[in-house]
Amino acid sequence: MSSSDSVNNGVNSRMYFRNPSFSNVILNDNWSDLPLSVDDSQDMAIYNTLRDAVSSGWTPSVPPVTSPAEENKPPATKASGSHAPRQKGMQYRGVRRRPWGKFAAEIRDPKKNGARVWLGTYETPEDAAVAYDRAAFQLRGSKAKLNFPHLIGSCKYEPVRIRPRRRSPEPSVSDQLTSEQKRESHVDDGESSLVVPELDFTVDQFYFDGSLLMDQSECSYSDNRI
């Protein structure tokens, strides 16, 4: 059994703490194990009081010992309401995960009997949640239940929407025009001119042979004389 001196309101008092063999020490009169003096009347009075209490079945209780670090530690406050941080993997309002890993935002329009209105597909659930918040605020105003109410009206955060990829590039206007459509009239400096396609004329050389023409003319002349 051990003791420690403390000052309480200017009066010295002695505190005693429990020892596993406390009862045996008092009942067996093992004075050497007690921090009491036989010559001190006050110590003897304390000893007699403790002995009577132990004989009646009383055992001292040990108060819980707390370290200084635990005493100075502030109590943990539980976050609640809309300001509570979202846990990882938590489902946001108006956000659904696509099978391929992207996140779609949608909202029910009360003006269309609660029909779902698709708001787009996004890379992260936070972007989809912000897109839902903006649509919900436009539909319901201050009564809307939002995922991030502190971002409403802020232009600092802009959700990135995924644009669908085109399967094939769109053909240009020049590719769509055929050769016939290219041969059209155009206006140049106020005067209209018609673009005429080149024509391929195939001429038989027989009709342009000079000797043959002379032979034909002589035959026709002789025929006239006869």
Swiss-Prot record:
DNA-binding region ranges: 91-149
Induction remark: Strongly induced by wounding. Induced by Pseudomonas syringae tomato (both virulent and avirulent avrRpt2 strains), independently of PAD4. Also induced by methyl jasmonate (MeJA) independently of JAR1, but seems to not be affected by ethylene. Induction by salicylic acid (SA) is controlled by growth and/or developmental conditions, and seems to be more efficient and independent of PAD4 in older plants.
Location within or outside the cell: Nucleus
SMART domains from the UniProt entry: AP2
UniProt superkingdom: Eukaryota
Gene Ontology BP term (one): ethylene-activated signaling pathway
UniProt KW keywords: Activator, DNA-binding, Ethylene signaling pathway, Nucleus, Plant defense, Transcription, Transcription regulation
Intervals of motif Nuclear localization signal: 96-112
MF terms in GO: DNA binding; DNA-binding transcription factor activity; transcription cis-regulatory region binding
PROSITE patterns, per the entry: AP2_ERF
Main subcellular location: nucleus
Function field: Acts as a transcriptional activator. Binds to the GCC-box pathogenesis-related promoter element. Involved in the regulation of gene expression by stress factors and by components of stress signal transduction pathways.
Family as reported in the entry's similarity comment: Belongs to the AP2/ERF transcription factor family. ERF subfamily.
Protein name: Ethylene-responsive transcription factor 13
Organism of provenance: Arabidopsis thaliana
